[in-house]
């Protein structure tokens, strides 16, 4: 179904709602553009597992092709220069140096778990915190992104 077709379904249901015809509006949504609940089974990754993926990908952000840094080096700067190179454990942007967002590697599911992607190694790549946040639950096609080659191992 195209985005235009989806918009037309919502438009048709909206017109019915304006006429206070909730039942027909709901029927149109349920029959043509219903919400599908998905059971998500997600595992958590420890630092050793993440590091293995970072090394496999050569510390390259696979969504941008940019180099990323070993997380330890950024934490060294925050330890020595806490005011000039701040880090916040909950990633508050106004309290975390931008280097953490741009250069700290994290892992991401290429095909999001939330949309049916598998929690398997071939669906996991290295990316920056920033690109992981931007990508969220979108697909590469939706964002018009591609996967860049891994770096030297």
Feature locations, PLM:
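A boundary/linker detector
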Residues: 1-52, 58, 65-71
């Amino acid at each position: 179904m195209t985005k235009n077709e989806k918009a037309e379904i919502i438009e048709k249901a909206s017109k019915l709602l304006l006429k206070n015809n909730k039942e027909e509006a709901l029927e149109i949504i349920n029959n043509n553009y219903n919400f599908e609940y998905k059971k998500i089974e997600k595992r958590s990754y420890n630092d050793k597992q993440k590091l293995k993926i970072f090394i496999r990908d050569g510390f390259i952000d696979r969504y941008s092709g940019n180099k990323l840094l070993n997380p330890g080096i950024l934490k060294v700067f925050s330890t020595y220069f806490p005011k000039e190179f701040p880090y916040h454990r909950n990633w508050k942007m106004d309290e975390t140096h931008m280097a953490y967002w741009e250069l700290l590697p994290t892992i991401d599911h290429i095909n999001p778990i939330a949309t049916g992607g598998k929690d398997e190694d071939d669906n996991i790549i290295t990316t920056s915190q920033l690109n992981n946040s931007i990508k969220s639950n979108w697909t590469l096609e939706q964002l018009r992104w591609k996967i860049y080659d891994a770096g030297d191992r």
